[in-house]
Amino acid sequence: MDAASLALMAKDMTPTPVEIPGATGGRFLIQLLNEDADRGVVTSIIHLPAGGHIPAHLHRAGSEMHYVLDGDLIDAGREFGPGGFLTHAAGTTHGPHESRGGARVLTVQHWQSRDGKFDFHLTGKAAAPPPGGTAAAGLPPDPTAPNLGTGDAEAPTG
């Protein structure tokens, strides 16, 4: 297999702790399947603990997709079980995410981190799009620009 390809078995990867700004209710874990955007979309499995809560947030650099592998995921009050699918355009406030009994969620993003910084920005209420455009239109073009006071996420810890 060449350097532009990747093949692995997720079940063989040990989940590692990940710090998610504002998250409460237990220890969140991640299996980072592909972080190299040159090889394709950034792909991970997020393990939400029973009672886990991730506050409303957005991603500036690209869209994000969630597919519930097992357990329960609650997104802004709407419940999803295995097979549940959600997707959000860049700059779209989504969440809060919660799980009553725990969940494993396949997450696919166009871009996730650079220099150890995740593209994760806490928000308050769902932001309305600026006049004449989408929510992403009013965002800074550089996803690595500091977002002071909003709790940019840290890299996975292990």
Q: Regions from the language model: what does each represent?
A:
Residues 26-59, 79, 89-93:
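Conserved short histidine dyad/triad with adjacent acidic residue
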